[in-house]
C-alpha cells in the first residue's frame, strides 16, 4: 500500500481490504511503503515463493511491484488508487481476471506502462517535485504543464542516447 497515493485515500481503501481479509480469514499481510523503491524491495524478499501481490497505489507503485515480480512465480494484482492510474485505465476492460502483458527494460529498470523523455518526462518529474506545494493534488500535473517553460529554462538538455538491443522478448 502506498499510503500517500490518491491524496491519502489509499489508507482508507487499505482499511476496508484489511477488514474484509480478516473477516474471510485470509492468509495475508498488509505492507505500507515508506519511500521510493520500498515496494520493489519488499516484493523482492518473496522471490522463490508463490505469492499474489495486490498493488494499492498509483502507476509508480504498480511499476515497482511489476518490476519485482519479474522472473518469479509471483503475480501482480492492481487496486488502482493514484492520481492518474494510466496503466489500469488502459487495461481495465480487457483484464478482468488474468492476462499477460509486455514489460520492457531500460538499463536495470523495468516498465509496463510508459517510458518517455522530453516534455512528458520533465512534466512528470516536475509534478513529483511539486508534491509538497500548496496546490490541490489533482491540479499539480496541470500546474507542471503550465509552468514547463519556467522549469526548463535552466535545466534543458536535448541530448539523448538510445541503444536498441534486439533480444527476445521476456
Per-region residue spans from a language model:
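Gly/Ser/Thr-rich loops at beta-strand to alpha-helix junctions
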Residues: 6-7, 58-60, 85, 119
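Acidic active-site catalytic centers that drive phospho-/nucleotidyl reactions
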Residues: 2, 59, 100-102
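ATP/NTP phosphate-donor binding region
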Residues: 1-53, 63, 67, 71
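Catalytic core of DAGKc-family lipid kinases
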Residues: 24, 33, 72-169
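Glycine-rich beta-strand-to-loop/alpha-helix junction loops that act as flexible
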Residues: 3, 56-58, 79-81
